[in-house]
A protein has these predicted regions:
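Substrate-binding/catalytic cleft of secreted carbohydrate-active enzymes
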Residues: 1-189
Length: 190
């Protein structure tokens, strides 16, 4: 609660704040619900989103977690035939936006067309900008422009992942992972 209340009180007058988020990839529990309720009461002018609020157990079609942070897969739930976090038709009532991370273009279109989803849909992360990426934006935006329910999304993360390091010849470069001697500290294509 304290982090959220401090953030909201501190940032409530910033014109670039268009909505509040209850966190990032930290599960869901009573503290999230309480923080969302407090935030909405303190600032009713902005909407609330949180990707951790995926799936409302009171809604038809809800697919429960099989363990912390792990959703049932298509093999475990052949009725859904897809990852359950994207298949859950709606999110908890504490949030006003259905948030999804990295949906495919087809998954985004399914959410837009799903009659059980009555709230706006936001890709809270998509088109990860690490390395040689950020492709397919045209496909996403064709779908977004077709459906009023879709808000768009936030490209993650529009920043260089490296740290400035001297190159030994008087210059510098953006170093990452194995550039610091360890071969275990890297991300996939780095």
């Amino acid at each position: 609660m304290e982090r959220v209340t401090r953030m909201v009180v501190r940032d409530r007058n910033h014109p670039s704040v268009v909505m509040w988020s209850m966190g990032n990839e930290s599960g869901w529990g009573p503290n999230h619900a309480a923080a969302a309720a407090w935030t909405k009461e303190f600032d009713p002018t902005r909407i609330i989103h949180y990707e951790g609020a995926q799936g409302n157990p009171q809604r038809r079609g809800y697919v429960p977690l099989r363990s912390v942070g792990k959703w049932k897969t298509a093999e475990e739930d052949p009725v859904k035939g897809e990852y359950a976090d994207l298949a859950n038709p709606d999110d908890r009532d504490a949030v006003e936006v259905v948030s999804r991370m990295y949906p495919t273009v087809d998954e985004l279109e399914r959410l837009a067309c799903d009659t059980l989803v009555r709230r706006p849909v936001l890709m809270c992360e998509y088109a990860h900008a690490m390395g040689n990426s950020v492709g397919g934006l045209g496909d996403y935006w064709r779908v977004i422009r077709r459906h009023d329910k879709l808000l768009g999304g936030h490209i993650w993360d529009w920043i260089d992942q490296g740290l400035r390091k001297a190159d030994g010849r008087g210059g510098w470069f953006w170093a990452y992972g194995g550039d610091f001697g360890s071969r275990e500290n890297h991300d996939a294509n780095f």
